[in-house]
């Protein structure tokens, strides 16, 4: 028995297919989903969705959003997403360096919108790197 999985971003259908198992980065931690899962809606954090089909794992970098789980169907609506195998690791690593440089300009306790933006960019770059390497 398989789960029907759809990952949708505003400008594209990122992934549509079946999976035996799905692991989502929810805002409260990793959420493992198997066929017959209880119905729920959850917020998705910046992180990596992992799906298993035929003993093969595939990773998708997610940039925050929501997921709806209904028994054997998972619909993930995100701000943006990239399939791990399509991510250019060098570009993601460069984005991480730039975000870390941007954050180094602020003190540890400083609250600034630019610092918050840089922290978010670090999370995005790390998710992209992790998805690309898995």
Curated annotation (Swiss-Prot):
Top-level lineage group: Bacteria
Membrane topology listed for this record: Peripheral membrane protein
Keyword Oxidoreductase: no
Cellular-component GO terms for this entry: plasma membrane-derived thylakoid membrane; proton-transporting ATP synthase complex
InterPro entries: ATP_synth_F1_dsu/esu, ATP_synth_F1_dsu/esu_N, ATPsynth_dsu/esu_N
Keyword Ion transport: yes
The entry's keywords: ATP synthesis, CF(1), Hydrogen ion transport, Ion transport, Membrane, Thylakoid, Transport
Subcellular localization: Cellular thylakoid membrane
A GO MF term: ATP binding
Family annotation (HAMAP family): ATP_synth_epsil_bac
Annotated family: Belongs to the ATPase epsilon chain family.
Function (record text): Produces ATP from ADP in the presence of a proton gradient across the membrane.
Identification of the protein by name: ATP synthase epsilon chain
UniProt organism field: Prochlorococcus marinus (strain AS9601)
UniProt gene name: atpC
